[in-house]
């Protein structure tokens, strides 16, 4: 199954800006991989909360549409809130 998530490049980085994003129901994330510069991105909580519950999400390639450009990635890690059904941060790796 293929998954597509709309995302934007983050202009601010750091703990304070990440907290502001989470408060606005956004998920801060990073895309990294060998030979490429890491990208810090942000996307809506509603875009990922349901699809990440699928069993094949972590083994399938995911298409992130970052500011209109398709980027193929694979989910590597998700940090979840301790008791709320929220994703606090996501790590993706370039494919």
UniProtKB/Swiss-Prot annotation:
<keyword id="KW-0689">Ribosomal protein</keyword>
<dbReference type="InterPro" id="IPR020055">
    <property type="entry name" value="Ribosomal_bL25_short"/>
</dbReference>
<keyword id="KW-0687">Ribonucleoprotein</keyword>
<dbReference type="GO" id="GO:0006412">
    <property type="term" value="P:translation"/>
</dbReference>
<dbReference type="Pfam" id="PF01386">
    <property type="entry name" value="Ribosomal_L25p"/>
</dbReference>
<comment type="subunit">
    <text>Part of the 50S ribosomal subunit; part of the 5S rRNA/L5/L18/L25 subcomplex. Contacts the 5S rRNA. Binds to the 5S rRNA independently of L5 and L18.</text>
</comment>
<dbReference type="InterPro" id="IPR011035">
    <property type="entry name" value="Ribosomal_bL25/Gln-tRNA_synth"/>
</dbReference>
<dbReference type="InterPro" id="IPR020056">
    <property type="entry name" value="Rbsml_bL25/Gln-tRNA_synth_N"/>
</dbReference>
<dbReference type="InterPro" id="IPR029751">
    <property type="entry name" value="Ribosomal_L25_dom"/>
</dbReference>
<dbReference type="GO" id="GO:0022625">
    <property type="term" value="C:cytosolic large ribosomal subunit"/>
</dbReference>
<protein>
    <recommendedName>
        <fullName>Large ribosomal subunit protein bL25</fullName>
    </recommendedName>
</protein>
<comment type="similarity">
    <text>Belongs to the bacterial ribosomal protein bL25 family.</text>
</comment>
<dbReference type="GO" id="GO:0003735">
    <property type="term" value="F:structural constituent of ribosome"/>
</dbReference>
<comment type="function">
    <text>This is one of the proteins that binds to the 5S RNA in the ribosome where it forms part of the central protuberance.</text>
</comment>
<dbReference type="GO" id="GO:0008097">
    <property type="term" value="F:5S rRNA binding"/>
</dbReference>
<keyword id="KW-0699">rRNA-binding</keyword>
<keyword id="KW-0694">RNA-binding</keyword>
<dbReference type="InterPro" id="IPR020930">
    <property type="entry name" value="Ribosomal_uL5_bac-type"/>
</dbReference>
């Amino acid at each position: 199954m293929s998954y597509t998530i709309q995302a934007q490049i983050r202009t601010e980085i750091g703990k304070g800006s990440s907290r502001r994003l989470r408060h606005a129901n956004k998920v801060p994330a990073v895309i990294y991989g060998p030979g490429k510069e890491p990208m810090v991105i942000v996307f809506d909580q509603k875009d990922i909360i349901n699809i990440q519950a699928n069993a094949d999400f972590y083994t399938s390639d995911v298409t992130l549409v970052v500011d209109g450009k398709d980027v193929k990635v694979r989910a590597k890690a998700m940090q979840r809130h301790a008791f709320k059904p929220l994703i606090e941060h996501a790590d993706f790796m370039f494919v």
